[in-house]
């Protein structure tokens, strides 16, 4: 489920104004925790440029067993290099304590951007660091590792399942020199070590959370 808002018309690319996107609520197994995400796209005419700009602010909200009130646990703000952003809610872990999400950042009007895999631990109220997946793959390869990573779910034992693929620079046919994944496939991430191991191509991802529409 994605909170993804744009100031532009999809078919024409014309600026149509500010917009907001809110996901449904994702409930953890056992029902103790709930989460939703929102993204707000604000259109503004920058005084220094002839072109209007679109800037996103995306937020993740979580409520716990002691309160029905949702509180923001992650706020992704625009930066000069990446005015666009969004949050994808992927799933809650089988034990119901950890939320897997994808934090997207990009620059409007270009192919520049990326996905950051994050895990929110509802018990400790902490988010995993942005570099966790890069660190795990670099450790596995034994050198700096560039790749395209996207979270897809949890294994039955509670480890993170993600897809990893080669990393290409914009307009290039060959992956960058640091690209360490030859072809797209499923990988298992141990967030404690951190470490990764490859999964079979036929791996089937289970779903554990409930969606409230």
Question: What residues fall within each predicted segment?
Answer:
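Sequence signature of WD/YWTD-type beta-propeller architectures
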Residues: 1-93, 97-213
């Amino acid at each position: 489920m994605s909170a993804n808002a744009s100031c532009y018309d999809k078919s024409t690319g014309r600026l149509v104004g500010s917009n907001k996107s809110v996901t449904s609520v994702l409930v953890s197994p056992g029902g103790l925790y709930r989460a939703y995400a929102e993204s707000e796209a604000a259109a503004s005419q920058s005084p220094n440029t002839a072109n209007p700009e679109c800037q996103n602010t995306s937020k993740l909200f979580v409520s716990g067993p002691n309160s029905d009130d949702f509180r923001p646990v992650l706020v992704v703000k625009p930066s000069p290099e990446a005015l666009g952003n969004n949050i994808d809610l992927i799933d809650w872990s089988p034990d119901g304590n950890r939320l897997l999400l994808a934090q997207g950042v990009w620059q409007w009007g270009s192919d520049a951007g990326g996905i950051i895999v994050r895990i929110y631990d509802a018990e400790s109220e902490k988010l995993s660091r942005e570099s966790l997946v890069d660190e795990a793959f670099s450790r596995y390869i034994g050198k700096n590792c560039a790749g395209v990573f996207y979270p897809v779910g949890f294994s039955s034992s509670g480890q993170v399942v993600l897809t990893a693929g080669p990393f290409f620079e914009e307009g290039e046919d060959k992956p960058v020199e640091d690209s360490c994944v030859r072809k797209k496939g499923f990988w298992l991430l141990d967030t404690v070590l951190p470490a990764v191991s490859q999964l079979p191509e036929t791996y089937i991802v289970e779903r554990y959370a409930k969606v409230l529409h």
